[in-house]
Structure formats: C-alpha cells, structure tokens
Amino acid sequence: MQDERPVDQLTEAEAAAELARLAEAIEAANTAYHTHDAPQISDADYDALRLRNRAIEEQFPELRRSDSPSDRVGGALAEGFAKVRHEVRMLSLENAFDLAEVEDWIERIRRYLGHVGDLLFTAEPKIDGLSLSLRYEKGRLVQAATRGDGETGENVTENARTIADLPTELDGAPDLLEVRGEVYMSHEDFAALNGRQEAAGQRLFANPRNAAAGSLRQLDPAVTASRPLRFFAYAWGAHSEPLAATQHEAIARLAALGFTTNPLTRLCTGPEELLAQHAEIERQRAALGYDIDGVVYKVDDLALQRRLGFRASTPRWAIAHKFAAQLAWTQLEGIDVQVGRTGALSPVARLKPVTVGGVVVANATLHNEDYIAGRDSKGQEIRGGKDIRVGDWVQVYRAGDVIPKVADVDLDRRPEGAAPYRFPETCPECGSEAIREPGDSVRRCTGGLICPAQQVERLKHFVSRAAFDIEGLGAKQVEALWRDGWIRQPADIFELPNRYREGIQRLENREGWGRKSAENLFAAIEARRRIALHRLIFALGIRHVGETTATLLATHYGSWAAFEAAMTRAEVGAGPEWQDLLSIDGVGAVLATSLVTAFHQEAERAAVEALAAHLTVEDAEVRAPVASPVAGRIVVFTGTLEKMSRAEAKARAEALGAKVSGSVSARTDLVVAGPGAGSKAKQAAALGIETIDEDGWLRLIGDA
C-alpha cells in the first residue's frame, strides 16, 4: 500500500474521491480472493486498504458510502454450485497489527459493556484456508456450505463428506447444530499434490490455501476425494441448544463430538497474556506444518458475546492479530499494465521468481504511476523518493501466501542505463487516451465500451451473482464467447438463442458445450429477460455503483423509465434532476457525476438502450417498515444509562428501525434521559419533545 496523505489533512472532495477508489480496490480484491481463489494483492495490502477506508469514514462520517466496504463480507459465489442461505451470517474479523490495537479493542469492549469485571479471552491460531459451515440435524451431516458473501454460500455437501477428519455423524449433539471451521491442506500434502500435478502435466497450485479452496469447490466430488483436505473446527452457527457457557468450553465440547480443534488454543486474562500467546504461536509457526497468518482473540464468556453482538461485517467480541509480513529481494524483469472494468490502468511487476515464506512468487502489484515514481497520490515521497525501474533489485513481501508488493529498491544494485519508467498515457488495449482526473490516484482509459479490456470485464460483471446471475454463463464462458466475437455488449447475450441455436454456428458445437448445456443456457437467458430494477442498475457496471447503491437508486426512482429519464435529463452540478439525485442518502457528488456521465456517453447510452429493448424491468419493491414502536423515529440518548452502555442502547434502537441522533432538534421524536442529563434534557423540554427514563425505554421496546 502506498504511503498516503494523512486522513486529517484531506479535504472533503479528496476524501470522497479516496473512498471511491478504496471501494473499487477492495471489491476487486474480494472477488479475486474469495471467488476466483487467485488473490492479486497481499493480505497486508488488503488490510491497509480497509484500515484507510475505515479511518476516512470515521473522519468524514457524512461521506460514508452506501456500498461501504466496511459493511461487506467475502466475495461473489463461484459458478456451478447451488446456493445456501446461512441461517446465521458468516462474518469476517476485525484486524489488529500490534499491542496498541489489541488494547484499543479491549477498551472498546469495556466501554460498550459498561460495568464489567475482569475479562477472559481465548487465543487460537488463525488458519489460512477456506471457511466452511456444517449443518447437522439429529446428529447427521445434512449440508455443508462455504462462506460466500457471508449471507449466501455454495453448497459443497458431497465434497465435504470426503474430508477424512470431518465427522458425518455426531453422538450427543444438539438436534440442530451448525459447526464452523476452516478447510486447509498441510505443507506435506500440498507438496505431494503439486508433485502429482507436475507429473501429470497439470497446473501447479500457488499455495496450500488456493489448493484447499480449489479442491473443495470441485464440481466432481471424486476430485475432492483425491485431495488431502483437513478441517479445524472453531465456531458454530445455528443451534437448538447452547454448547456451553464459554468459548473454551464450547470448543472442548466440539472436540468431544469428534471434531479436530486446534491444540494451541489458550485461555488468557488480558493483553499481556494475549501478546505472549501470539509470540508463542508465531515462534512455532514454521514447524506447525500448515499455514496460519495470525492469532484470533475472542471474549470467552458467551453471554458477553451475545451482548456485544455484531457490526455490519464483524463481531465486536473477536479480533485477528495478524503476523508481520515476510520479505525477500529479487530483480524486476518487466512492468505490464492491465486494464480493468472501469478503465483503470494497473501496473503489475514481473519478477524473477523468488521464494518468499515458502512460496514462489513472480508478480507484484505496483498500484499506480505515482507509486512507481516514488511518491504518493498527493506528491509526497515514499521509499525515500526512490523510483522503480525495470532491471532494479526490489524488496518484495508477502503476508498470507499471495502475490506480494514491492516494498523497497536497492539503488546500489541498479543496472547502468536503467531508464525511468514512463507510464502509458494511452490505453495498451485500445489506444484511447488514458487520463487521470483530479483527486484520483489512477489513470483511466477513456475508451469506454470500445475498449476490449473494458468490454470483457464489464460483461463478466453483467453476469455476476448480484447482477443478472445467468446460470451457465460465468467468467470463463464470457471470455470465450467474447474472444470469438459472439458477444460484445450485454444486449448480445439476449441474442444468443436467436443467433446460435440453429444454423452453421451453433453453441452446442463449441468446445465444452453440448445440446443439453446449450439449451440450459438459452433457458436461463430467457428467464432473465425479466429482471429486478436494482439488479439492472448494478449490472450496468457504472463506476462507484455497488449493490447497496443500486438498491437505493431503485427504491428512490421506483421504475426503470423514471430512473432512465432522470439520468438522461440530469446535468452534472446543476438542475433539479441533479439535486434530486444528491438528495438520496448515500449518494454524493462523485457517485452522481459517474452516473450522469455514463448516461451521456454515446457508446454507453447505445448499449443501455439496446439492452433495455430485451428486458421487462420490475419496479422496485416498497419494503414494509420494521414493526416496532420506535421504527422511523429519531431518538436521542443523554445522561448515564445504568442497565446498558450507550453503544449497546444505540445498536438496539437502530436494530428496531430508529434513527439515533447525538443532538436534540425540532425533528427529534424521543429523548431517553438517564441520571445527569443536562442541556439536552432541558432543550427537549423547551421543545415539548417526549422524554422518558431508561426503564421507560426498556418497557417501550419490550426489554423490561
């Protein structure tokens, strides 16, 4: 991650642009890691992106995006598997990188809980594998699902049954029990698997995590059965009765039921003991025989876990304390520039292969032209101002067994005549001008849909899970059909049945296709001629428009006709349509500009009109409000709350549909005043606003 300008020095416009860039980068990283099992940046880079995103959101809360990465978990689902809705969400973890961040996490827990005595924690290795949820009913394994996006996963039940240390029957378990853990592959088994792959002339796996993920997600369970997968249990989801009263007792119960649990799990009393266990696990890391990338700390008392609850994508009661990165020196042999869906030009370092932490790596991210030149996007020096040139000896690091980043340059070993790298000002794919807008850290191709790279990437986005989700038409099929000229824009997908069902060129005659698979695809395409408005808006692939934003836009405009008309009439920066767009909660000037600009570009407009001609777009659903006595009301808490912390009260109110404000105004509906309430209570009385005490609040919401 490049050195960035301090968050407290950003202007509001710079912060908005930075949040947009971070959202795009994090979404791309999530898709590469969770969906394709082919990560493109290191764990450390990914963590840095999320940390900076969170820091900017905290500094500029009014700029928080409706599709904020802080609210997202995992990635899109792989093709070919049935979908499973998780009864209890599978969330990710907050990360810490040093003792200070661990202590801050503990202090936040204490503040949230209010009056609490000594806290106990468990510490366990963070396994670097693929998360899996196992559902047992009456002691029998009935379903296994990957995490997916946290809400919906992939059904891999038959594959999971082939894992040797995963029990298919339990004796003495609750009638319903979801056991969660990590599928992984040992170093020894990974080496043997790659040996067999090499002998058979097949592709080698980059690391054990990719091997485990790829093996579990095989469409043929026989292939999974031939792979030496293992499973550690460490958590649970839905259950008909509690496993125990504490985390460590629950883990012991899982072990008694026949699951493999990690023997390095320990009970700790505070930050010093947690740090000592972190150091001990890191000391043993090289000899464990499997990959870990940190230590997970959890509040031990399950009653406190329930009180602490969850944020949008992480539990408050757990955190992952990550290990430091691993370093190596190698030579930079070349720089390639790739073009993404939104036209971003991304430089990739081609390295002389080097082993870093036991994995051979040959590529690294170079982020953007500023990073190569030795400065951040604001012009401040990084790496002491040292630029990166082809032929340089560079220090690379990896954290999490993925493609590394370039951390430093050895000027003493720079070859004579090595020239400064000139970043292209035209697109390497289509030759269009590549421009860099103010506040943006990347250069982008202006070719739009005439750019081949953007065409194919946007087509992949169009058929993705949250967009049109056309069964049988995934990224690989899109690439092949695009390469042969069968599809160039989304509308072409809906022409496939007419063009390639009969005649000389038939889909069923293509490699990898047959009559049945072709007819199945044609049927899936026909089924998608009717589409929900929010899916269509998201599928257009307009920069900055994520799933949540698409839903907000659909809800606001109601119909495709209204949305299209508004975008067509809108002018950037002025007019009633522009003001109406900005009035949507979560839509800022950057996002609005992107939307309006897209609908005014000739090629984009033509593609949208061609697509719409094939579709029946369903109007947005009007969601029923949350049924509670405080739904839709603006609530203010003031004074000391004695039965719950302020944070706990806020979370409960918001869960019931209320909006919690920090100040009293004429728009306030209700003030909850505890002992010591001062000016806010007086202001509420002056305005005639209903005011109740904490007991009254608890009675109102039914928690008394």
Curated annotation (Swiss-Prot):
The active site is at residue 126. GO terms for biological process: DNA repair; DNA replication. Its EC number is 6.5.1.2. SMART domains: BRCT (SM00292), LIGANc (SM00532). Pfam families: BRCT, DNA_ligase_aden, DNA_ligase_OB, DNA_ligase_ZBD, HHH_2. The keyword Transmembrane helix does not apply. Keywords: DNA damage, DNA repair, DNA replication, Ligase, Magnesium, Manganese, Metal-binding, NAD, Zinc. The keyword Magnesium applies. NAD(+) binds at residues 43-47, 92-93, 124, 147, 182, 298, 322. DNA ligase that catalyzes the formation of phosphodiester linkages between 5'-phosphoryl and 3'-hydroxyl groups in double-stranded DNA using NAD as a coenzyme and as the energy source for the reaction. It is essential for DNA replication and repair of damaged DNA. This is DNA ligase.
